[in-house]
From Swiss-Prot:
Its cofactor is Zn(2+). It comes from Arthrobacter sp. (strain KUJ 8602). The gene is gbh. Catalyzes the hydrolysis of 4-guanidinobutyrate (4-GB), a metabolite of L-arginine, to 4-aminobutanoate and urea. Shows lower activity toward D-arginine (5% of the relative activity) and very weak activity with some other substrates, including 3-guanidinopropionate, 5-guanidinovalerate and L-arginine. Cannot use guanidinoacetate, L-2-amino-3-guanidinopropionate and creatine. It comes from the Bacteria. It catalyses: 4-guanidinobutanoate + H2O = urea + 4-aminobutanoate. This is Guanidinobutyrase. The lineage of its organism: Bacteria, Bacillati, Actinomycetota, Actinomycetes, Micrococcales.
Length: 353
């Protein structure tokens, strides 16, 4: 099938779906080439089939392949950005990391080392989980490559800043507390987005505030809208090296039923995609999409959502790689003036301080 791939600008792209049906053949992300089929990848998509850190429903170990299967529907041109990401840069699928499902500490070390190996030549990672435990080693690797503490946006229904759970320091509910303690996050530029639902106590919020996290709740997104949400986030992050971690349960269960710890009242898939599009020009150095658990999915709803979130993250990386003056706002069909509007909202917010 390799001769039936789309090629442009020296980059080997996905299998041509006008010649080979989307449902045919083994699934790689967006039907892209495997890493061993290209000389170098600017962006590497990699799976981490690990869910030994979950506190409720298991099954996220099967998430990466579920997202890959759903990504067969993706097409090479992203009209919301006016970008063909697979033409701008070389994107490849590295398959899955081989991690120990019975030893969380060893798995974390393996993920961190594999991430460092995959980024040794300058490639950026978009990682498909797996549960949220995997974010810690990925952040460690990203901060090491950046040479400094990095900014982070954490899209999630939950805070994931517990201290321990059943005495364990490393679970899917603790990665960002550990990351702050280890000094790998820039605590002036970290925020949760989409949080909601009951907590064990107010101390959870007090601790989170003490660590430096900003919080944009799902209700904030609903009442303030995408534009103000994006403006506030951009104002907080600036141009720092940025890592984006997306727990699919940030979405309402109507949009993402296939996850281990669902919470009612989430944001929509449209809101999530539009928020990411509003980050055009930001310095994204790595990203993950985690907690997709296909056993609880219906008609690939969650897999499709996860595949599109990853696609927007890859597009953001590809768009940043293009030189010239194209770093305006995504056209977003009806949102031609998004960039200018974000600036207006940001100025208004600044005037209220």
């Amino acid at each position: 099938m390799e001769e039936l791939r789309i090629e442009a600008n020296g980059n080997l792209g996905p299998i041509d779906s006008s010649r080979i049906p989307r449902y045919a053949g083994a699934a790689t992300y967006a039907r892209l080439p495997r890493l061993d089929q290209v000389s170098k990848a600017d962006v590497t998509v990699v799976g981490v089939p690990f869910d030994s850190g979950v506190s409720y429903r298991p099954g996220a170990r099967f998430g990466a392949n579920h997202v890959r299967e759903a990504s067969r529907l993706l097409r090479p041109y992203n009209p919301a950005w006016d970008v063909s990401p697979f033409e701008n840069i070389q994107v490849a699928d590295a398959g899955d990391m081989a991690v120990n499902p019975f030893n969380i500490n060893e798995a974390i070390e393996t993920i961190q080392q594999n991430a460092l190996d995959l980024t040794a030549n300058g490639s950026k990672l978009v990682t498909l989980g797996g549960d949220h435990t995997i974010a810690l080693p990925l952040l460690r690797a990203a901060a090491e490559r950046a040479g400094e503490p990095i900014a982070m946006l954490h899209f999630d229904a939950h805070l994931d800043t517990w201290d321990t759970y059943f005495g364990a320091e490393y679970t899917h509910g603790t990665p960002f507390r550990r990351a702050v303690e280890e000094g790998i996050l820039d605590t002036e530029a970290i925020s949760h987005v989409g949080t909601r639902g009951p907590l064990y106590g107010k101390k959870d919020l007090d601790d989170d505030h003490r660590f430096g996290f900003g919080i944009v709740t799902s209700a904030d997104v609903y009442y303030q809208g995408v534009l103000e949400t994006v403006a506030k986030i951009r104002d907080r992050i600036g141009n720092r090296p940025l890592y984006i971690s997306v727990d699919i349960d940030v979405l309402d269960p109507a949009h993402a039923p296939g996850t281990g710890t669902p919470e009612a009242g989430g944001i929509t898939s449209r809101e999530l995609l539009e928020i990411i599009r509003g980050f055009r020009g930001m310095n994204l150095v790595g990203a993950d999409v985690v907690e997709v658990a296909p056993a609880y999915d219906h008609a690939e709803i969650t897999g499709v959502a996860g595949s599109h979130v990853a696609y927007e993250l890859v597009t953001l990386m590809a768009d940043n790689a293009v030189e010239g003056d194209r770093h305006g706002a995504p056209n977003g069909y009806a949102q031609q003036a998004l960039g200018a509007r974000i600036q207006e909202v940001a100025q208004a917010i600044g005037g209220q301080r």
